[in-house]
């Protein structure tokens, strides 16, 4: 059996954060480095080994601006609704305010990020309508692991990323600018850059014991096996 350095692997898995304010906008990211991340992503599991994922890597300033403007158009109504909801429930929560601030920042500077990676998939979730056996979940489950693998590979190479989807409301506009056919589904936009600072720390999460159920829903006692 292969042996891995679990401390190093767990550190990678638990400190791959959504990076916004710490993206280094001043450093060019070599295409070879991005391609290395894509190579890693192609080893992600995919149902039937269909390998329907495709990557459109955007480093052209004019095309990045198209994506950023679509993102801001999608972001505005989303963040307004979020801020209203927060103000009614937890208006003074510093963690929430920090997230809102970093989200605002990313929307403002998105076109300045060195690389915007657009993961795509051939076909559409609609292709699975009427499919027996959880076809819709299988469709997404066959493409999204590759995106996460890309983000982990980027983190291991000193790059920061963030998973964003708000440009998708205007995916046709972006698709036209990037030459993406209508038969291809855009999955996300992953801004990619070197990050500022030394490292990242673990996020605040609920204990595994509280969210793990043994043999029946909401039986969360770890001794319940």
Mark where each language-model region is.
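Glycine-rich, charged/polar anion/phosphate-binding loops
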Residues: 40, 100-104, 174-177, 197-199
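Glycine-rich phosphate/pyrophosphate-binding beta-alpha loops
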Residues: 44-50
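Glycine/small-residue-rich phosphate/adenosyl-binding loop
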Residues: 57-143
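A glycine-rich helix N-cap at a beta->alpha junction
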Residues: 76-88, 178-202
């Amino acid at each position: 059996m292969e042996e891995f350095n679990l401390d190093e692997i767990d550190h990678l898995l638990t400190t791959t954060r959504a990076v916004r304010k710490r993206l280094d906008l001043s450093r060019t990211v070599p295409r070879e480095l991005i391609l290395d991340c894509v190579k890693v992503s192609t080893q992600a599991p995919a149902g039937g080994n269909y390998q329907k994922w495709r990557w459109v890597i955007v480093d052209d300033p004019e095309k990045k601006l198209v994506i950023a403007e679509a993102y801001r158009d999608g972001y505005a109504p989303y963040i307004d609704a979020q801020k209203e909801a927060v103000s009614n429930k937890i208006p003074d929560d510093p963690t929430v305010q920090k997230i809102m601030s970093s989200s605002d920042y990313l929307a403002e500077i998105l076109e300045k990020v060195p690389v915007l990676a657009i993961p795509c998939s051939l076909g559409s979730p609609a292709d699975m309508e009427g499919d027996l056996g959880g076809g819709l979940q299988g469709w997404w489950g066959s493409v999204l692991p590759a995106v996460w693998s890309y983000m982990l590979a980027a983190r291991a190479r000193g790059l920061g990323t963030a998973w964003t989807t708000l440009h998708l409301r205007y995916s046709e506009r972006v698709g036209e600018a990037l030459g993406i056919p209508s038969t291809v589904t855009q999955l996300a936009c992953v801004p990619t850059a070197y990050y500022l600072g030394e490292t990242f720390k673990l996020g605040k999460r609920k204990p595994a014991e509280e969210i793990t159920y043994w043999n029946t829903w909401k039986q969360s006692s770890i001794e319940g096996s």
